[in-house]
UniProtKB/Swiss-Prot annotation:
The lineage of its organism: Bacteria, Pseudomonadati, Chlorobiota, Chlorobiia, Chlorobiales. NCBIfam families: thiol_BshC (TIGR03998). This is Putative cysteine ligase BshC. Pfam families: CC_BshC, Rossmann-like_BshC. Belongs to the BshC family. It comes from Chloroherpeton thalassium (strain ATCC 35110 / GB-78).
């Protein structure tokens, strides 16, 4: 499978696509060295750091038997494949380590970068096992389902023709402040899914397969989280992917030590984040994660409520007026840890307390978050994982490839890589460059030269004929004028054709922009994976995996299909 790579900093079409922190993190420059040394525990580029992390994590004690039981139970519910259960069992050994990634539980797995994150984790486990054959590395996908931002997950974006369509659903039964992933699928949702989204899939050789895949995952009465996990398990059935939900009591029990320490020591973890964030901002970067005095939520009547400290050792649940003493909250943490939910600041700490995490595969925004978390890892006495950038891709459908092949010919280039690079940098400037190169003939100049030449020929011819018969000169004049009029007509037709040719080219580039940068945003952040699976089958996942096994993840990859 062929691919072309573009440095992240070169992608500026549609505005700045990446934060400065992410650009520095992936640029392999002195800025990268300075950033990583100050704000991260490990350098993802350095094999010595991976070796050290392997030794550190394998030497720690985890609740492995209990973890294996919980992961087995969950993945049986999700319908995971046999290889997944082999890998879960391998976690009983200290020599089995996790490469973790995760995402919110969006409809139909959300934007296609969810697929790329998952593939990135799988690819790293295979690469690292080759280099460290005495250790097993297992890919783990963390379901981020407890967030109560329903709007964040309740939509699907597809291309209909060349127009971006965003399909959103508002669940009438959704209770404000409840976990979005726990929302139950209703008959109304299934009706919307069938009529709005599945009907939007263009006819293809794989449409029926895709419809079956979705319908077998999204069923009445199951939660959004369960539907997401079931679909993800089917897509990666043969890859040994372990999927984990942090919501069940069995998992929360493994994490209760974090809840207890947070409640006993608040606002210490927030102060750690604030101090680290201040250093980050002094270095010219933005601090994105906002800590709270207590970085936990509390479930009450299915609502995920903030825990706010009050005077005299009490806490209040917000919104609302329920109060508990600090002692009562600690009792809950010991006896009913499922009532607690970490916020963005504490979630990684929970994750890496329970899982033997050697690395976390992160998107650009997550990499920025982790830059604020180093002190908190130290505070909770947990090794911070290697923060590895996920693979970033744009898929080039055949019709789009042909546009760039045509562009390359106009620009006299052997490959499309140059055209792609200039397109992602500034599409309008790229169009102007194409028009200049395409207009190889100056019609006005050529027509003027032809008219002048023909006029000279006819005048000489008229002079010769007038020597024989002076009246013939008038006939020559008429023929000349008719001929010159024909040249003028040809000039007008040529100019019109040239303009039309340019208009077609411009239209093709703009259609390409709708596909590669829908809404001015990178394709991977907008389009759902089923836009591609419906056209190219889910075997596309295996093809992309084979490609990524040969690539680093330090540039944006353009992949012709």
């Amino acid at each position: 499978m062929q691919s072309y790579s573009i440095p992240f900093h070169s992608i500026s079409e549609g505005g700045k696509q990446f934060s400065q922190l992410f650009l520095d993190y992936t640029s392999n420059t002195l800025a990268t060295d300075a950033l990583i040394s100050q704000f991260y525990q490990h350098d993802y580029r350095n094999p010595a750091h991976l070796s050290a992390q392997i030794q550190t994590v394998s030497g720690r004690t985890y609740q492995r038997p209990e973890l294996v039981l919980e992961l087995t139970r969950q993945n049986q519910l999700f319908g995971s494949g046999p290889k997944t259960f082999e890998r879960i069992q391998s976690l009983l050994s200290k020599k089995t380590l996790a490469v973790v990634t995760g995402q919110q539980v969006g409809f139909l797995t959300g934007p296609v970068y969810t697929i790329y994150k998952t593939l990135s984790a799988i690819v790293l486990t295979e690469k690292w096992h080759e280099h460290y054959p005495d250790f097993e590395f297992v890919p783990v996908f963390w379901l981020e389902s407890e967030d109560h931002d329903y709007e964040e997950i309740s939509h699907v974006s597809l291309l209909k023709g060349n127009s971006l369509e965003r399909f959103s659903y508002s669940e009438a039964s959704y209770q404000a402040l409840s976990s979005a992933g726990a929302t139950q699928i209703t008959p109304e949702f299934l009706d919307w899914l069938g009529k709005e989204i599945l009907e939007a899939f263009p006819e293809s050789d794989y449409k029926q397969k895709m419809l079956t895949l979705v319908r077998e995952s999204y069923k009445e009465g199951v939660s959004y989280e369960m539907a997401f996990a079931t679909l993800l398990a089917r897509l990666f059935y043969d890859e040994g992917l372990i999927i984990v939900s942090s919501h069940p009591k069995g998992f929360k029990t493994l994490a209760k030590s974090v809840f207890i320490r947070e409640l006993e020591t608040f606002p210490a973890s927030s102060q750690n984040i604030i101090a680290q964030s201040a250093r980050l901002e002094e270095s010219g970067y933005d601090a994105q994660a906002k800590p709270r005095p207590i970085n936990l939520y509390f479930f009450q009547e299915n609502q995920r409520l903030k825990i706010e400290p009050r005077r005299q050792g009490s806490v209040e649940l917000l919104p609302g007026k329920t109060t508990f003493s600090q002692h009562e909250m600690l009792e809950f943490a010991h006896s009913a840890p499922e009532l607690f939910s970490p916020n963005v600041v504490l979630r990684p700490i929970v994750q890496d307390t329970v899982l033997p995490t050697v690395a976390y595969v992160a998107g650009p925004g997550e990499i920025s978050y982790f830059g604020q978390f180093l002190r908190n890892y130290q505070f909770f006495n947990i090794p911070m994982p290697i923060i590895y950038p996920r693979a970033s891709l744009s898929l080039l459908e055949p019709k789009i490839s042909r546009v760039f092949e045509k562009s390359a010919r106009i620009l006299n280039e052997k490959e499309i890589s140059g055209s792609l690079s200039r397109f992602y940098q500034n599409s309008q400037q790229f169009i102007n460059e194409l028009l200049l190169a395409a207009s190889t003939v100056d019609i006005e100049d050529e027509a003027t030269t032809a008219i002048q030449g023909l006029s000279d020929i006819f005048k000489k011819f008229g002079l010769k004929l007038s020597e024989i018969d002076p009246t013939l000169a008038q006939s020559v004049e008429k023929v000349m004028q008719s001929t010159l009029n024909q040249v003028e007509n040809l000039k007008s037709k040529t100019i019109k054709a040239e303009k039309q040719r340019h208009n077609d080219l411009i239209a093709q580039i703009e259609k390409s922009r709708d596909n590669l940068l829908p809404g001015g945003v990178l394709q991977e952040r907008v389009l759902n994976g089923f836009h591609f699976f419906n056209k190219f089958d889910t075997t596309l996942i295996k093809l992309l995996k084979e490609l990524l096994l040969t690539k680093a993840f330090d540039k944006h990859l353009i992949v012709p299909l």
